[in-house]
């Protein structure tokens, strides 16, 4: 790893407040669904993708509320394993709800993720990795039906190319 060293006559000190990042907040919100309890995500940004994730959490039975910059997710009431297309289409990374639903309920039904200005976001790495961990996955009419009758298990997975998104599931 490369290091940059800055030398000067005065020592730097102080604090810097960083804004919350969408790419961290979204996987944390989805992961909250895998816990039979309450999760608090602090410094959570106010963005449309975060709002879409909160809608999905509420739809599947979570209680979600904001206080200042924190989002609290009470996932004790999860009762649905399906996420309707209109909610999935609100954010491109909505596929990150697949693993928490599988782990928690043993099944999940989702449609392909939502749009992105960059272009199509394939989810084949997500699906092949989940299959290696014991998931059974079928598709019909654009809907992924997933189950893991024997539960998900750990597995050594080698991705065919580097992918941050595939590791979030």
What do the predicted segments below correspond to?
Residues 1-169:
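Structural preference for solvent-exposed beta-strand-turn elements
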């Amino acid at each position: 790893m490369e290091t940059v060293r800055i030398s000067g006559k005065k020592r730097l000190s102080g604090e810097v407040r960083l804004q919350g990042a969408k790419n961290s907040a979204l996987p944390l919100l989805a992961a909250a669904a895998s816990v039979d309890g309450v999760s608090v995500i602090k410094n959570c940004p106010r963005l449309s993708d975060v709002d879409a994730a909160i809608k999905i959490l509420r739809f599947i039975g979570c209680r979600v509320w904001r206080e200042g910059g924190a989002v609290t997710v009470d996932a004790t009431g999860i009762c649905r394993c399906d996420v309707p297309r209109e909610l999935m289409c609100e954010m491109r990374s909505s596929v990150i709800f697949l693993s928490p639903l599988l782990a928690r309920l043993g099944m999940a039904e989702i449609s392909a993720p939502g749009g992105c200005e960059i272009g199509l976001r394939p989810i084949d790495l997500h699906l092949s990795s989940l299959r290696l961990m014991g998931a059974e996955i079928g598709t019909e009419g654009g809907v992924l039906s997933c189950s893991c009758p024997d539960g998900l298990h750990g597995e050594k997975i080698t991705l065919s190319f580097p992918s941050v998104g595939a590791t979030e599931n």
